[in-house]
Amino acid sequence: PGFFDDEVRSLGGRIFMGPGLSPLKYPEYLRYMKTLLDREKEIKVLHAHNEAMEFYALNGAKKAGFPVRIAHAHNTHLPRGLKLPVKLVCKEMIPGAATDYFACGREAGIYYFGEKRWNESGVLIHNAIDLERFGYRSEVRTRLRREYQLEDKLVVGSVARFMVQKNHTRMLEQFACLKKIYPNSHLLLAGEGELQAAMEEKAK
């Protein structure tokens, strides 16, 4: 299940659950994409956001006959780990599998697609956030501090997905130093993700 599943369905959208994006499941993924396109003929566009591993989705869509295949870059580096060599190879093959190249910033676009391709056909898509919803409101501040018993505390907050790029490990280490100077300080981390349990354990 995804975080936005209910919202997608409430707006009339449908969700198709495919195989995981991994080298071992690639043949299965190709068959899935072909079956999906044969069954859902109104689908003409695939928009992928899976870092380097989006190559599998894009190339599967290409072989299945999707006419529009959008690669969307969000990062300027790939995290270190056992999968890094595979991800680096996949990243280099993304441009050949996509028809359109989106990025949330110029640096991310150049990293994934190369400077020449980005300058010629890259599309900059700013992350869409309604700033009005998150503007400062004194009444909200007062209510939340009272609700969480933080009225006279120093509060540090972060809203971010629990993933390597957001560096919650460093955040917790820095806050531990702050706590020694200001014992009445509190750190609030809002988000979810694959590292949430690990960060909860580290915070203890």
Positions of predicted regions on the chain:
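Nucleotide-activated donor-binding/catalytic signature segment of Leloir-type glycosyltransferases, i.e.
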Residues: G12-R14, E200-K204
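A conserved, positively charged/aromatic
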Residues: R9, K63-F66, I70-C104, F113-W118
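N-terminal strand-loop element at the rim of the active site
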Residues: P1-L24, E28, A108, G193-L195
